[in-house]
UniProtKB/Swiss-Prot annotation:
Keywords: Amidation, Neuropeptide, Secreted. GO terms for biological process: neuropeptide signaling pathway. It is found in: Secreted. This is Pyrokinin. Its main location: secreted. One of its GO terms (cellular component) is extracellular region. It comes from Rhodnius prolixus (Triatomid bug). It comes from the Eukaryota. Position 8 could be leucine amide or isoleucine amide. Mediates visceral muscle contractile activity (myotropic activity).
Length: 8
């Protein structure tokens, strides 16, 4: 996932 997207 992109670095600016939160990891859930």
């Amino acid at each position: 996932s992109p670095p600016f997207a939160p990891r859930l």
